[in-house]
């Protein structure tokens, strides 16, 4: 059997056997095409790309802890080109967070600023810790870290309406601003669920498509400042933290990764009502 899984196909329900142990975890080379963290039978596939890195480490943390409880260096044969990939078996999705450390050259003229001590957020993270409450500064000294999310949402037969461009009636909106005020009359103001509650209103207006202002994870407090005793924050969201992570402050429930589930539920319900 080839040591690499780059040429293998992930078959639903099929669990590949681990091949070795690193830092107490059973592992094997991963599926290099699956960037980010992907749940597979028996474990999680971690894949990250870096053009300049000479080494890569996967850091595992207990939820909320400052220091990693395990550091898993990627062996050289877990790398193809610029891509590192590893399957970690026995990964506890509910209790663990993860991040990376990358080493490499430091040459600002070439745009390279590798720091082997710097803890890095996965650029393909699908859920991020540290920003679940709107308008609150992330005081954690470790900054942002990633969570692994389940990929078992039931989309049913959800399909977008495929409305011709010339027939679209588009409503652009800010998820928080659309329902945050009490006049919206929703149970979950300022959230994906709050927007879902307003679908009948959108249909009354004749809307058949919605365009959402940034819904990825962003840090509204990054450039916060007081002007005339008014707190100004980055309300609109053009200050990204993680492009692939739904904004956790837009979740009505603050359980880990509920933002992803609520966003998917919103999309499914919009489609069911003929709205793209």
Predicted feature locations:
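Carboxylate/His-rich catalytic cores and anion/metal-binding grooves
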Residues: 202-230
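Short proline/glycine-enriched turn/loop motifs at strand-loop junctions of beta-rich domains
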Residues: 49-55
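The feature marks proteins involved in alpha-glucan
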Residues: 2-41, 69-70, 78-83, 90-172, ...
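Conserved, mostly hydrophobic/aromatic
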Residues: 48, 100, 173, 202, ...
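A conserved hydrophobic secondary-structure block that centers on an alpha-helix together
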Residues: 174-210
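Aromatic- and acidic-residue-enriched carbohydrate-binding clefts of CAZyme catalytic domains
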Residues: 184-188, 222-272
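Loop/turn elements at helix/coil->beta-strand transitions in domains of secreted/extracellular proteins
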Residues: 168, 205-210, 272-276
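Structural beta-strand segments of beta-rich domains
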Residues: 42-46
């Amino acid at each position: 059997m080839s040591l690499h899984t780059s040429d293998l196909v992930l078959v639903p329900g099929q669990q590949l056997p681990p091949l070795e142990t690193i830092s107490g975890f059973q592992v094997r080379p991963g599926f290099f095409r699956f960037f980010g963290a992907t749940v597979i039978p028996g474990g999680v596939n971690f894949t990250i790309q870096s053009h300049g890195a000479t080494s890569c480490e996967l850091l595992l943390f207990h939820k909320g802890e400052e220091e990693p409880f395990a550091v898993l260096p990627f062996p050289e044969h877990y790398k193809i080109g610029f891509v590192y990939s590893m399957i970690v078996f026995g990964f506890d999705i509910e209790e663990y967070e993860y991040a990376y450390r990358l080493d490499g050259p430091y040459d600002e003229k070439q745009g390279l600023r590798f720091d082997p001590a710097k803890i890095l957020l996965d650029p393909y993270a699908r859920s991020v810790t540290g920003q679940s409450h709107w308008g609150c500064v992330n005081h954690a000294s470790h900054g942002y870290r990633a969570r692994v999310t389940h990929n078992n949402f039931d989309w049913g037969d959800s399909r977008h309406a495929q409305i011709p461009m010339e027939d679209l009636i588009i409503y652009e909106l800010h998820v928080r601003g659309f329902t945050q005020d009490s006049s919206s009359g929703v149970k979950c103001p300022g959230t994906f669920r709050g927007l879902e509650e307003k679908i009948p209103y959108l249909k009354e207006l004749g809307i058949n498509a919605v365009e959402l202002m940034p819904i990825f994870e962003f840090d509204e407090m990054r450039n916060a400042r007081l002007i005339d005793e008014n707190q100004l924050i980055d309300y609109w969201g053009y200050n990204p933290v993680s492009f692939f992570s739904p904004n956790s402050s837009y979740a009505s429930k603050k359980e880990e990764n509920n933002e992803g589930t609520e966003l998917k539920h919103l999309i499914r319900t919009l489609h069911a009502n003929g709205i793209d």
